[in-house]
A protein has these predicted regions:
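Extracytosolic ligand-binding ectodomains
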Residues: 1-451
Length: 451
């Protein structure tokens, strides 16, 4: 949430927001009320979030008048998607979830007698920061004021200045770089920043008895931030880290793998194989890294860990499943809350494309819904008005990914992490299974599968 920001809702809408996440689809009368200029109402929402070792109190005050001229026609929502490039394996599933949300939202609007529709305009960024900015500028030229995405922190960092300067509201489903946690800007993120994932990774690895880790990581906003967060948290536990940074555009990782292989060999002689590991902080190129690691005996004999860039990554199992299964590649990713909404979306995406969605399919679905509710709440298509009311809506919304409470920087206020591993199926193929769960409140790992 944003410091000092006042959020506008009518008294009828304020009451509705307390339950809107649970009753979407059964609130037809709400929109009729929202189309009539209401009296100004001030509401205050205070949420106390306990996240060991810190307890955070988040307060949002709403004092803006909603209403005015009734919205009509198509309301455009931009979507900066990784339909190709280094995160294409994620983009396909997220695009599917977004289309499901768009259809459901428009059915909701139709049933409630509204004169406007919610239109998603998808643009492929190819996971390239420069192209993401070009696509945002193109959307802005077409009058788009609200944008979903992009997927990567590198892209978000590159578009942030333009979005802030031009008052375009951007809500990312998956950007996690801690450096982008900035209060009172025009950027929200429906995931926690990587200070949380760094803590989860350090606990996961240290609890396995590992004291020395080679980190092979992508040299961009996301990779740099996550490597730093992990190294800081792991260092607190007495662990040693050797970071090896690579160019995000690289296709040959022999230099990095050779360095890692030598360091692992040195450590194994000094401390034993059980005390060393590799942490891979990569996107889809993790498949290439794993394939090329076949040439390095020390790396193949070592347990690997991954992150949200590899967890449930379809390219990893299709291109390098045998290597990933051998080294395990235990990968952390923000955990959705299991609920009927979660299960419904999971089955819908699976039926549409034959793949289970990952967490960011759930968060992008929730972004679409919360933006639709925000538009209806304010009664205007205006980024600043939506920005003001958005934290209160998220604080009272329970979606497919769970409760969407935000912190002072406009990012999700923490949560647990699922830990995924690659296994060989009875059919001889490879798949991801949830192997463990990291609980943030207790700072503990619970295993669901044999290690």
């Amino acid at each position: 949430m944003r410091n000092g920001k006042k959020l506008g809702v009518s008294s009828a809408v304020a009451a509705l927001l307390l339950v809107v996440g649970l009753v979407i689809g059964a609130v037809g009368g709400y929109f009729v009320t929202a189309s009539v200029p209401p009296a100004t109402t001030t509401i205050t929402t205070t949420q106390i979030v306990t996240q060991t070792p810190v307890t955070t109190t988040v307060t949002a005050t709403a004092t803006v008048t909603a209403g005015g001229a009734r919205l009509t026609g198509e309301i455009p929502i931009g979507a900066l998607m990784s339909l190709s490039g280094d995160l294409a394996s994620f983009g396909k599933r997220e695009s599917t979830a977004l289309k499901i949300a768009e259809k459901e939202i428009n059915e909701w609007l139709r049933q409630s007698g509204q004169a406007w529709t919610f239109r998603i305009i998808e643009e492929d960024t190819a996971t390239q920061p420069a192209l993401a900015l070009q696509k945002l500028q193109s959307l802005a030229a077409r009058g788009v004021k609200l944008v979903i995405g992009p997927l990567s922190s590198g892209e978000l960092r590159n578009i942030k200045g333009y979005a802030d300067s031009n008052r375009i509201l951007v809500v990312s489903q998956s950007s996690t770089a801690p450096a982008l946690a900035v209060p009172d800007d025009y950027v929200f993120r429906l995931v926690p920043d990587d200070n949380f994932q760094g803590k989860a990774l350090s606990k996961l690895i240290s609890s396995a008895g590992v004291s020395h880790v080679v980190v092979i990581y992508r040299g961009d906003a996301w990779g740099d931030g996550l490597q730093e967060a992990f190294a800081r948290e792991y260092g607190k536990l007495g662990g040693e880290v050797v970071p090896i940074r690579y160019n995000p555009d690289a296709k040959d990782f022999s230099a990095e793998l050779s360095t890692a292989n030598a360091k692992i060999g040195e450590w194994v002689k000094s401390y034993g194989a059980s005390k060393v590991a590799v942490l891979d902080i990569s996107f889809d190129e993790a498949a290439l890294i794993l394939l090329q690691a076949k040439d390095y005996a020390n790396l193949l004999a070592t347990r690997w860990y991954g992150t949200d860039g590899t967890a449930q990554n379809s390219r990893v199992i299709s291109d390098a499943g045998d290597v990933a299964e051998k080294v395990k590649l235990y990968s952390t990713i923000f955990a959705a809350t299991s609920s009927p909404k979660y299960e419904k979306l999971r089955s819908q995406v699976k039926a549409a494309i034959g793949e289970d969605p990952e967490i960011y399919s759930y968060t992008i679905y929730d972004i679409a819904w919360t933006l639709a509710i925000a538009i209806a709440t304010t009664g205007v298509y205006d980024a600043t008005a939506i920005k003001q009311v958005y934290p209160t809506i998220c604080a009272n919304y329970f979606g497919a990914s769970g409760w969407t409470l935000l912190n002072e920087a406009g990012d999700r206020a923490g949560g647990d992490y699922d830990i995924w591993a690659v296994v060989k199926t009875p059919q001889g193929t490879y798949d991801w299974v949830k192997a463990a769960v990291y609980n943030f409140a207790s700072d503990s790992v619970t295993w669901l599968q044999p290690t």
